[in-house]
Amino acid sequence: MNTLLVNQLQKKLGYTFKQNELLLQALTHRSASSKHNERLEFLGDSILSYVIANALYHRFPRVDEGDMSRMRATLVRGNTLAELAREFELGECLRLGPGELKSGGFRRESILADTVEALIGAIFLDSDIQNIENIILKWYENRLAEISPGDKQKDPKTRLQEYLQGRHLPLPSYVVVQVRGEAHDQEFTIHCQISGIDQPVKGMGTSRRKAEQAAAEQALIQLELE
């Protein structure tokens, strides 16, 4: 692995690893090695959820559980994590198998998002919970400052449905048009058909649910509600 790129990545993360093998594992997709990052991803997902929930709890003392859950979902969802990954220029450091490299896996949102979670797990194991909490809060500083409770935090499918119901229009239909990849690493493509948009709107994700949410989000953008 390119030492210069790894050093630049650690600088952007705001953390230098003591155990380089943890960093290497966090950057390794299952297509590249049997010692991949999925266990670290599992750990990082739980840590991220706790840190963001704790931050929202103290930042919004009068907000109810529903709004806090929606804000947390916005902050920890895949496209937010993929945005962070692109800010870190993480794609250049990923260890991918030949098939994923050929298909552009270093750009795929799901792989980028999963790797951010794996890095969180790796930093925790390399240090402690207080350290990773401080690092996550630094990464999310602007996003936490900008987020607020309300309808904007409802998931895209809910907002699209409420918009259409409010105008007495038919509910959207979601159709799976493609499933790509092996069972452990699939990518779904969904077409969403709604009144007011002539052509189906496309969404992609690592599950049918995520692809439907992505399609609904694109529909909201086309309806100029985002």
Curated annotation (Swiss-Prot):
Catalytic activity: Endonucleolytic cleavage to 5'-phosphomonoester
Active site per UniProt: D45, E117
Gene Ontology molecular function: double-stranded RNA binding; metal ion binding; ribonuclease III activity; rRNA binding
GO biological process: mRNA processing; regulation of gene expression; rRNA processing; tRNA processing
Keywords, alphabetical: Cytoplasm, Endonuclease, Hydrolase, Magnesium, Metal-binding, mRNA processing, Nuclease, RNA-binding, rRNA processing, rRNA-binding, tRNA processing
First-tier enzyme category under EC: hydrolase
Ranges of residues in domain DRBM: 155-225
Example of a GO cellular component annotation carried by this entry: cytoplasm
The protein's required cofactors: Mg(2+)
Primary location: cytoplasm
EC number: 3.1.26.3
InterPro entries, alphabetized: dsRBD_dom, RNase_III, RNase_III_dom, RNase_III_sf
Cell compartments where the protein resides: Cytoplasm
Role description: Digests double-stranded RNA. Involved in the processing of primary rRNA transcript to yield the immediate precursors to the large and small rRNAs (23S and 16S). Processes some mRNAs, and tRNAs when they are encoded in the rRNA operon. Processes pre-crRNA and tracrRNA of type II CRISPR loci if present in the organism.
Entry-linked HAMAP family: RNase_III (MF_00104)
Family: Belongs to the ribonuclease III family.
This protein's name: Ribonuclease 3
Source organism of this protein record: Proteus mirabilis (strain HI4320)
Gene (UniProt): rnc
